[in-house]
């Protein structure tokens, strides 16, 4: 028996992990003539605020808020109910946005500078008692701190510091896989009664990308909001965006709400998902057959297993996806108890049905 533990932090659809006899010359097509096996794992119930809709933010405004009430869409003036939720205890945060300014002049300002958008997460204490938060792991990166290097996207990541090479999403995921907290983030913070604090902010030049993943625990109830501010000079300017009651422009799925409800389109996540961890255990004899297990399977792509590995939302904005499609910010911990005479190859693949083209999985896995 060869135990193999594979923690992954993933955000891609339709990943599959086959364990197959090592080929003498070349790999055959993934799963050719073979079937996949469901993992039959489970998500935990840790609430995670996801701010990913709109992915491409066009200007200043609120992105998502869990306070009671509503905010007005920049495109239509329509009031949209907030993703109302109060956190208390263990929690998580996932933020992923691009800045594509509606005002195209901000792409290139005088002096060769680009206009900047500040993404910020705000903590809100609605009650009469102070709330203390402790953070155990996480990071915030933008694409200028962690750029994509197209010629060096994959590779082994040593345990020590290294230049990130696969973008801000991978940079933050690696920090989570290592269970480390970015030294630039506070490991604890107290929100006074009836108060609001800016937890962190990152300035994002036009056409840039930012990603944040964070895990923590509170000793009392609190709420969160994520906002975008153009050229703020202080935290007061950031809080003023929340007080404006105006959503950031770029919500392209507002006109497709019926298609979201019917399942015709996924949209992106703006709300609170239940689950930051998925655990499964598989026993298999490789002398009997290869093993194929899907990761992040959906109702559209389950590889014949009938298993949907997507966690639900406890609260969502109207134009959000119906669940945490893509399982962003979820750590998949899969324990493979394998036996066989070997040698065998462990392959992480991103199969595309019917030869269609998709963005390849470029995330990180940890193997123990």
Where are these regions (language model features)?
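Intrinsically disordered, low-complexity Pro/Gly/Ser/Thr-rich segments with frequent PxxP/GP/PP motifs
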Residues: 150-205, 368
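Solvent-exposed, conformationally flexible loop/turn segments
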Residues: 88, 184-197, 207, 288, ...
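Short aromatic-acidic-glycine turn motif
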Residues: 140-156, 223-225, 354-367
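Asparagine-centered strand-capping/turn motif at beta-strand->loop junctions
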Residues: 97-101, 109-117, 122-131, 137, ...
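Bacterial N-terminal signal peptides that target proteins for export
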Residues: 1-8
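C-terminal segment of classical bacterial N-terminal signal peptides
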Residues: 14-23
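Acidic, serine/threonine- and glycine-rich low-complexity intrinsically disordered segments
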Residues: 192-321, 325
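N-terminal, Lys/Arg-enriched amphipathic/low-complexity engagement segments
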Residues: 30-92, 96-98
